[in-house]
């Protein structure tokens, strides 16, 4: 949501560790406790939730980028992984059977547009629970990502 400019050094370092280097970038991480602690630390600058396989597949197909700027295709996934399509890989990823590192040369972030229709009414300065866009939002992250892809 918000970029790392003008923030405390420890928050900037945490955002760098998560590869969130610019506004409107997206990374997919699992729910291990160390990641959840990092998200709590930067909760006033990002939003997060649980993604569905359809959203992961759309992210990979439309915004996934390989080294050299090449797009992620079904052919590339079937040649370089044990999965036949991006949708099958996304399903396996959401069930914790695959990692994004299984796709060779995939960049670890997704560069997204600002959301169509804007952020929630409270903007990017209030938490999601108070009508804003920041912090934990659960399954509602899928709606936001669909508007940003």
Curated annotation (Swiss-Prot):
The keyword Transmembrane does not apply. The keyword Ribosomal protein applies. GO terms for cellular component: cytosolic large ribosomal subunit. One of its GO terms (biological process) is translation. Belongs to the universal ribosomal protein uL30 family. NCBIfam families: PRK06049.1, uL30_arch. Pfam families: Ribosomal_L30. Part of the 50S ribosomal subunit. GO terms for molecular function: RNA binding; structural constituent of ribosome. This is Large ribosomal subunit protein uL30. InterPro entries: Ribo_uL30_ferredoxin-like_sf, Ribosomal_uL30, Ribosomal_uL30_arc, Ribosomal_uL30_euk_arc, Ribosomal_uL30_ferredoxin-like. HAMAP family: Ribosomal_uL30_A (MF_01371_A). It comes from the Archaea. Keywords: Ribonucleoprotein, Ribosomal protein.
